[in-house]
Every structure is written in structure tokens, then in C-alpha cells.
């Protein structure tokens, strides 16, 4: 999926609002995903998955940091997430559909915290960006 110059600008704009809340939004995204899609819990058998868990907060911060990294390197998402792509494809072997589920949950978190900023145009750009991130993270599965 190709991001237009306008999409890139929109993504950078929304990430400027959310990057200071990385741990909070990342953890909330994971909690929402675990609740809505309980099958995703299977990748975290060693985690305390309860609300407010330190492990969920720490991993949520990593998830948000990866998204911020991708947004900061929006012209080279593949390069920015190369090591993470290798990790998920070769070691963790996460089912690729889970990246889409995570993206949906992230979108909901952004909508909850920044409803006026998530205009239809921004929403479309963020969706394209999250799809691009998911494509990068699954590119080495083939």
C-alpha cells in the first residue's frame, strides 16, 4: 500500500499527538486486543495479562515505540522495522492476522483519546499506515 504525501503528513500529525502517551496507549491497545480477540493471548503465556499489569505496560510501550519508529521513518518503514520483522517471522512466529487485529485496536485507542483529531481523512491515512506496518512485519514470512 502506497502512502501519499498527504497520508504521510496526516500520520506524522496524529503521531505528534500520541507519541508522548506511548506506554499508556500501547498497553491499552494490548489490553483491548486481549479482551476482544482472546486467541491473541496464546503468544503471551508467561505474561500477567490483567489490567494494569507491568508486563503488559512494558510490552505496550515496545509496541507503541515500534509504531512511532515507523512513523518517524515513514519513507523507509521496512528499514525501520527490519529487525522486528525478522523477530516475528523467525522466532516468535506470530500469525500475520494478529497485526491487523492489533492495528484495529490501536485505531480504537486513538479514536477514544483524540476523537476530534481523528477526522475521516486522518483515519484513512492512519489505517493505510497500519496496513503498511503489518505488511512489513509479515513480509519475511514468505
From Swiss-Prot:
* Spans through the membrane: none
Question: In Gene Ontology terms, what is one molecular function of this protein?
Answer: organic acid binding
Q: In which tissues is it expressed?
A: Red blood cells.
Q: What are the binding positions for O2 in this chain?
A: 59
The alphabetized list of GO BP terms reads: hydrogen peroxide catabolic process
Q: What PROSITE patterns has UniProt attached to this entry?
A: GLOBIN
Determine if Transport is one of this entry's keywords. Answer: yes
Q: Which residues form a coiled coil?
A: none
- Pfam families named among the record's database cross-references: Globin (PF00042)
> Has keyword Metal-binding?
yes
Q: Which residues bind heme b?
A: 88
InterPro entries linked to this entry: Globin, Globin-like_sf, Globin/Proto, Hemoglobin_a-typ, Hemoglobin_oxygen_transport, Hemoglobin_pi
Quaternary assembly:
Heterotetramer of two alpha chains and two beta chains.
* UniProt name for this protein: Hemoglobin subunit alpha
Species source reads Aptenodytes forsteri
Amino acid at each position: 500500500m502506497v502512502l501519499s504525501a498527504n497520508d504521510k503528513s496526516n500520520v506524522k500529525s496524529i503521531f505528534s499527538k500520541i507519541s508522548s502517551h506511548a506506554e499508556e496507549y500501547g498497553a491499552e491497545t494490548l489490553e483491548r486486543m486481549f479482551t476482544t480477540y482472546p486467541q491473541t493471548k496464546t503468544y503471551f503465556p508467561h505474561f500477567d495479562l490483567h489490567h494494569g499489569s507491568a508486563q503488559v505496560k512494558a510490552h505496550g510501550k515496545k509496541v507503541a515505540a515500534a509504531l512511532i519508529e515507523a512513523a518517524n521513518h515513514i519513507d523507509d518503514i521496512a528499514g525501520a522495522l527490519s529487525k522486528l520483522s525478522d523477530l516475528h517471522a523467525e522466532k516468535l512466529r506470530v500469525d500475520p492476522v494478529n497485526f491487523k487485529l492489533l492495528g484495529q485496536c490501536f485505531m480504537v485507542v486513538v479514536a477514544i483519546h483524540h476523537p476530534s483529531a481523528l477526522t475521516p481523512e486522518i483515519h484513512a491515512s492512519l489505517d493505510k499506515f497500519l496496513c503498511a506496518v503489518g505488511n512489513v512485519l509479515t513480509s519475511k514470512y514468505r
